[in-house]
Amino acid sequence: MRIEEIHLYHVGMPLVYPFRTSYGDDDAIESLVVHLVGADGEGWGEAAPWRAPGYSPEWAYAAFLTVREWLAPQIVGRDVRSGADLRRHLAGFKGNPFAKAALDTAWWDLDASARGEPLWRAVGGVSPSVTVGADLGVMESVDRLLEAVEAVQAAGFRRLKLKFRPGWDVPVVEAVRRRFPDLPTHIDCNGAYTLADLPMFRALDGLGLAMI
């Protein structure tokens, strides 16, 4: 698949609820969007490493620059035959997994488009749709969180992920599970704990969480 053109977009989107986690606060999300154009189709990819290097060493604008200045010139005008072939073209640059992932997902979409196949089937999926979940961060109060959970459930979300950090932990999850016992719920700690905290995690065993 010859890559004829690459178009890059650095985009931002305000969040409905501010996102507070163990590594900081955000009221918007930024991402890199990649549009690949080939002779027989086009593909779109995205990477969203946030707008500051708090979650990872990469951030959205840095990923945009990395693709524009270094990665895109390695593949424009070249025949990229597979995902593995794409990785070989980019192997000379260390790290930058978000920037590379944006190109990788766009290549898979381009390849599926050229073959007239939906992307979900091309990558081995078994269904054209998936259950959508909501992700809620630390809030001003448990009551505010419960209101937010009720709102996202009413909007059609069927799974829930909660941010979890010291001071916003077991009692918060207990309150959510009491109010919404049938809503599949995950928690995400973002590296805020160590092995010394295992006893606290055992306290979650009876809450029926889908995943930690």
Language-model segments: residues:
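N-terminal amphipathic alpha-helix/helix-capping segment at the start of soluble metabolic enzymes
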Residues: M1-H10, A84-A91, A112-S113, E117-S129
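Conserved, mostly hydrophobic/aromatic
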Residues: I3, V34, D40, L71, ...
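Conserved active-site and cofactor/substrate-binding residues in soluble primary-metabolism enzymes
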Residues: I29, A62, T66, R81, ...
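A general secondary-structure signal for short beta-strands and their flanking turns/coil
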Residues: I29-S31, R68, S129
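Metal- or metallocofactor-binding catalytic centers and their adjacent structured scaffolds
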Residues: L36-V37, G41-A114
